[in-house]
Structure formats: structure tokens, C-alpha cells
Amino acid sequence: MPRIRIGNTKEVTEGKTVKFSFTRDDRLQEGFVGRFKGKLFAYDNTCRHLPISLDYGDNRFFDSKGETLVCQTHGAVYEPGTGLCTRGPCAGASLYVLEVIEEDGVLWFDEASLS
């Protein structure tokens, strides 16, 4: 399974996200990496309420204050640091965490971490 280059660490500033594609179970999927309170996080871009993207394809995951991640379709609210849904139709469920590696100023995702 390949190692996927997401981008430069500098691209993921506080409250910003970068999307990337990966393969799971022979299906192309999308993930996103962001930074909240100085720490990186990465999740599968799939709402836990229904299997749809959290964003509208526009790479907008944070609310207007930059404090929570929001599903743009049904309004489910997730904590950026944990992925836990705190409000909405999937309260108590968590986004699927993706392991991202920061190495020499570059962000990587290793598909082998999915197994």
C-alpha cells in the first residue's frame, strides 16, 4: 500500500484543512487533515450519520468561529481534536481517525495504517 503525500506542513495552519484521497477496501475515499489548537488531526471525510462528505466539496469543515467541525448537510457537530459528535443526529459517534505522519515539513498518509 502506498504512502500518500498530502502536502507541506505549512499549508495546514490553524483552522485550515487539506483534503486528500486514499484507497480503502478497493474504493477511493477522501480524508482531510487540519490543525486545531496547534495540533494536527485527520479524519475520513464521511459523516457518521449518513455516509456522505462532511463538506460540500469546498474544503469547509470548520464552523464560522473555527471551533467545531460541522457536517454541511445535516448539521452534525464534531470536536476537532477527538472527532466526537457532540450535537446532531449522530451524537456520541466519532469520525474515523486517520493516522498522518509529519516528516521533514511534509505530511504523509500511509494506507497501510488502515489495516
Question: Predicted regions span which residues?
Answer:
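A short acidic, glycine-rich active-site loop
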Residues: 68
